[in-house]
Amino acid sequence: MLVVKDTDGHVFGGFASHTWRKNVSFFGTGECFLFSLCPKIKMYSWTGANSQFLLAREECIGFGGGGSFGLWLDADFETGNSNPSTTFSNPALSSKTDFSVTSVEVWGMDNCL
């Protein structure tokens, strides 16, 4: 689970169904989703339109696709952008398409049971 707060106070993020790994192509499953927590709580589930769930490269990570990322962050988690994506049918999650990050939280759970 990745949660981002931008400089305008918007809080949003995404759930990754798989462990992040550097890859040249998209990975993940329909269990992935994007969400907004502030200013409005809303969840954006997989539409079934494509399988562009997660992308991880040395320079960035991204959620969703189909023309543009629903959520994209640079490798340092300092800047990002959010656009409508076909994968999750989300609007831009931040107040501006390109945003600066004030804080990031990441939670992960390993299959320990």
Model regions: which residues?
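Phosphate-recognition beta-domain surfaces
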Residues: M1-L113
